[in-house]
Amino acid sequence: AKCIGCRACTAACPTGAAAVAAGGRIQVDRAACRSCFACVRACCSGALSRIGEELDARTLVERVMAQHMSWRAEGGVTLSGGEPLAQPDFAAELLQRFREEGVGTALETCGYVPFEAFQKAAPFCQLIFFDLKCMASEVHRRYTGVDNRRILDNLMALSREFPDLPLQVRTPLIPGVNDGREQLSEIVQFLRRLPSLADYELLPYHNWGEGKYRQLGRSYPLAGLEPP
């Protein structure tokens, strides 16, 4: 509704990702977009805007701590994502600063990062939520695009190197993908070898991410799959 049809965004886009579609509507080709935000800077009407902002760890902690008095007594901070350990130095600094403030800390991870990332962040965590989708590497590759060897190695190494750090392992149950009795039994057998396993949680499938795929112009690979 804010677009005035000036087409400044299409002129500013270096890759041609922003283009005029049928009916004169501006459409962004997500595959061609480099997220340079030249179109946003050129938009004088505010029809295009950037979501999010870059902050250093100190500023972010200050903003969070400004709300600290409204937390419940058991409140704390959990780093989630995306994958927070994709920025291991930033994640470690955030966690350390929160611990220095006396705030409880936790971290959610898919585990597909260099183990050095865990070594940086784990000393400042009080709990880690670790996703383990399946044990079969071919199934994991088919549905996520990557092998799970690194994930399994990281989970075992993390539990052994930080035996006092509780691990809560979680498996999102996808009907027809990883919800078979044999598949779950393989996971349980592996988890029994972890020194610091605190809990194992099965998460029922949901399709809350379908709208995000639509906004990104991508097809949802599990379209038609109904939650239990």
Annotate the PLM regions.
Residues A1, R193, L225-P228:
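Short, intrinsically disordered, charge-balanced linker/junction segments flanking boundaries
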Residues A8-V28, A38-E53:
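Iron-sulfur cluster-binding cysteine motifs and their immediate structural context
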Residues G24, A32, E53-T59, R63:
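FAD-binding FR-type
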Residues R25, S49-G52, E83, Y143, ...:
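Pocket-edge positions in alpha/beta enzyme catalytic cores
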Residues R58-W208, R214-Q215:
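Conserved AdoMet/S-adenosylmethionine-binding subsite of the radical SAM
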Residues R214-A223:
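Short glycine/proline- and charge-enriched loop/turn segments
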